[in-house]
Regions:
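Divalent cation-coordinating acidic motifs and surrounding scaffolds
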Residues: 1-232
Length: 232
């Protein structure tokens, strides 16, 4: 994907993050390194740095079946951070740093930030460091249902400023002017991913009929190692 896009769009840049679930109530476990969003590489023009992060991702296990996809998409698009126990103090085991620290982030600007000035390329928008005037696109993949704070059938920790739900994801991606491309490895998440694509206008003409009305949700049937190779 990266190689093909670089040929078509020479100035395209890339970032990378992972997500498991909240380390709370058996959804995920801090002992396994589970978190709802982990920025691995901010948007950069250095594709080798992205490759290195993809290659070195450790195995996390989560707890129950759903995953924190909604929170991850929200943090990726919004980038304001998350304080799971609402104590205003950043806890590396459970919380998410804002991309850019400020007085109005959940830690009052004292919890650090995801942004690094040493990384080349990128910008300061969202939770990945999207560039001004670039088209932000988040490609996300999962094999599980999307834990949704707007759906009472899913439990969430009750963190600050709030646990992310479908509405937050749609609003943040829309405000960013971005797209979300979903990749599923099982049928359980299809409906939720299609709802996100529809609500954010993440559509294209993928069937060649001349109409940009196909939802950007795709099925992946290869291995995880194949996926890493395909991305880079």
């Amino acid at each position: 994907i990266v190689t093909a896009l670089t040929t078509l769009i020479p100035d395209a840049e890339y970032g990378f993050a992972t997500y498991d679930d909240y380390a709370f109530a058996g959804y995920g476990y801090s002992s396994s390194g589970d978190k709802p969003f982990i920025l691995r590489q901010q948007v950069t023009d250095n594709t080798a740095a992205v490759q290195a992060q993809l290659t070195g991702v450790p195995i996390h296990y989560g707890g129950d079946w759903p995953e924190s996809t909604m929170e991850a998409l929200y943090q990726g698009a919004y980038g304001k951070g998350y304080d799971q126990n609402c104590n205003g103090v950043y806890d590396a085991a459970t919380d998410i740093q804002p991309y850019i620290a400020s007085e109005d982030d959940p830690f009052g600007g004292t919890g650090g930030q995801g942004y690094s000035a040493t990384s080349s390329g990128g910008g300061e928008l969202g939770g990945f460091g999207f560039r001004d005037y670039a088209l932000p696109v988040m490609v996300y993949a999962t094999d599980a249902p999307l834990r949704d704070a707007d759906d009472s059938s899913y439990g969430t920790p009750g963190g600050c400023p709030r646990d992310a739900g479908f509405g937050d994801v749609v609003d943040s991606i829309t405000a960013l002017g971005g797209y979300a491309i979903g990749i599923m490895t099982s049928g359980t998440s299809v409906a939720q991913m299609e709802e996100i694509a529809s609500a954010t206008g993440s559509v294209a003409d993928t069937d060649g009929d001349g109409m940009a009305d196909d939802l950007l949700v795709f099925r992946w049937t290869g291995s995880s190692s194949d996926f890493r190779e395909t991305v880079t």
